[in-house]
A protein has these predicted regions:
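Membrane-embedded beta-barrel scaffold of Gram-negative outer-membrane proteins
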Residues: 1-8, 106, 114, 148-208, ...
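Face-selective signature of the C-terminal outer-membrane beta-barrel domain
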Residues: 1-93, 106, 165, 169-177, ...
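Transmembrane beta-strands of outer-membrane beta-barrel pores
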Residues: 2-6, 31-33, 42-48, 85-91, ...
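Outer-membrane beta-barrel strand-turn architecture
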Residues: 29-33, 73-81, 97, 105-109, ...
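Transmembrane beta-strands of outer-membrane beta-barrel proteins
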Residues: 36-40, 81-83, 113-115, 155, ...
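Surface-exposed extracellular loop regions of Gram-negative outer-membrane beta-barrel proteins
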Residues: 46, 58, 91-96, 110-156, ...
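Gram-negative outer-membrane beta-barrel transporters
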Residues: 74-77, 172-182, 200-277, 347-349
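C-terminal beta-signal and adjacent terminal beta-strands/loops
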Residues: 183, 295-350
Length: 350
């Protein structure tokens, strides 16, 4: 992949080219009750900044070698086990060992549960939401002698139930509980002389929450309802703070009408609760709504979308910068900047 990063604001410019590649080779061995997959991969990420002033260049070349093995085992009629282990060697940052496990319990024909967990990591980079907010201005390069991998440990459990009422109404519900522990999170800290430096915190971030998804079907209608609660906190030096740009409450709802090979009609609405911002303020709550219609024929279809038809955008209920137009200080973008959009088209089947 190739990404040309260019930012131009009054009295400051940022420009650079980012390229990334991924390659993998794997071998699969399948038997009656088990399946093995093993392989290796190579991942690269390179960024070269254009020298526009005397500020240190934020160039980097990240290369990761990995090897993995995973197994799926139908232990019994009611238990499926999936296990895996991955070892990555990240040049300049060392080895990351990543086990994972997942168990699916088929308790009845209508009720099942899944329990899982695993490790993860992230390589330090200047390209984060925090640094993007200030257009990477005065952000010092990542220092491989100071910075290190962010390592995460997580687990989740979910419960699934499905049934039919009166032979016409289908109902299913999924209830998920999750927890993630992020050790040594990478934080952007203000330094002397107006500079910013990414520092790995000595603390941690923990994220816990629940997610509920309901699906109801009747004839050609389907209703999807969802609710997500997320509580994310930074533990640092004995102080507990909520992390920014994480709404605690999200609600989604989608109503679909679909006649196979004839019509598709959809109405959707999404709610986002107030959330803490990086500058200490609290963002506003907002709702996004959309409507879509598609008419299908044998060889083609015609569709039209009405996106965000309530015209919810951050510039209507909050600011996106402080200061002057010629010398702005940009705030977090937590809601759409585009308002009501209409788009349509024709799909051809060849």
């Amino acid at each position: 992949s190739y990404f040309n990063r260019i930012i131009n604001i009054p009295n400051y410019s940022f420009e650079g080219k980012q390229t990334a590649s991924f390659s993998e080779a794997s071998y699969t061995h399948i038997k009656e009750k088990t399946e093995w997959v093993a392989g290796a991969n190579l991942w690269s990420d390179n960024f070269q900044e254009k020298q526009l002033d005397t500020f240190p260049l934020r160039n980097y070349n990240q290369i990761t070698f990995g090897a993995f093995a995973q197994n799926s085992w139908k232990a019994t009629k009611w238990l499926n086990l999936e296990t895996g282990f991955r070892a990555d060697y990240v040049i300049d940052y060392g080895i990351a060992l990543l086990p994972r496990v997942s168990a699916l319990f088929k308790i009845t024909d209508k009720f099942s549960s899944r329990l899982g967990g695993g490790f993860g990591y992230k390589t330090p980079t200047i390209f984060t939401e925090e640094s993007e907010r200030i257009q990477y201005q005065n952000v010092m390069p990542i220092d491989k002698n100071i910075n290190k991998l962010e390592r995460s440990y997580g687990g989740n459990v979910d419960f699934n139930y499905r049934t039919v009422f009166g032979e016409k109404v289908t109902f299913s519900i999924n209830q998920l509980f999750f927890y993630t522990y992020l050790n040594n999170p990478l934080l952007l800290e203000y330094q002397t002389g107006g500079l910013y430096q990414f520092i790995n915190s000595s603390g941690h971030i923990d994220t816990r929450g629940t997610e509920t998804n309901i699906k109801i079907g009747y004839d050609d209608f389907k209703l999807f309802l969802g609710y997500t609660f997320t509580d994310t906190r930074l533990h640092q030096n004995g102080i507990l703070t909520n992390t920014p740009l994480t709404p605690k409450h999200r609600i989604n709802s989608v109503l679909m009408y679909e006649v196979e090979d004839k019509w598709k009609v959809g109405l959707e609405a999404y709610y986002f609760s107030p959330q803490k911002l990086s500058d200490g303020a609290t963002g506003k709550q907002y709702v996004l709504c959309g409507f879509m219609v598609e008419k299908l024929w044998e060889k083609f279809s015609v569709y039209i979308n009405f996106e965000n038809f309530l015209d919810a955008r951050q510039t209507r209920f909050d600011t996106i910068y402080t200061g002057t137009v010629t010398n702005p200080v940009f705030r977090d973008i937590y809601a759409p900047l585009d308002g009501f959009l209409i788009n349509g088209g024709i799909k051809l089947k060849l």
